[in-house]
Amino acid sequence: MSEKTTAQERNHRKVREGYVVSDKMDKTVVVAVENRFKHPLYGKIIRRTTKYKAHDEANIAGVGDRVRLMETRPLSATKRWRVVEILEKAK
């Protein structure tokens, strides 16, 4: 019992990378994340895109930026991700 620590240990949080496709909302960006996988039977590489709404507290991400997202608690009805860092600014 003495092995308990006073600081709560965080669970593993999912991390995704994608491109900002919309920044028209206040403190929110829409990020398109591409998922590539091989078809189990035919072997073709398939690209699937998922769009996540992510929290951007400082409104610094713009359309075309490559960003890293991290999963967080639900911030609204559809927002469960937050922008951790901007990996590459749009040209």
From Swiss-Prot:
Residues passing through the membrane, by range: none
Keyword Ribonucleoprotein: yes
Entry-linked CDD domains: Ribosomal_uS17
InterPro entries linked to this entry: NA-bd_OB-fold, Ribosomal_uS17, Ribosomal_uS17_bact/chlr, Ribosomal_uS17_CS
Key words, A-Z: Ribonucleoprotein, Ribosomal protein, RNA-binding, rRNA-binding
Coiled-coil region list: none
Gene3D superfamilies listed in its UniProt record: Nucleic acid-binding proteins
GO biological process: translation
One GO CC term on file: cytosolic small ribosomal subunit
Function noted in UniProt: One of the primary rRNA binding proteins, it binds specifically to the 5'-end of 16S ribosomal RNA.
Name of protein: Small ribosomal subunit protein uS17
Organism: Thermobifida fusca (strain YX)
Gene that this polypeptide is encoded by: rpsQ
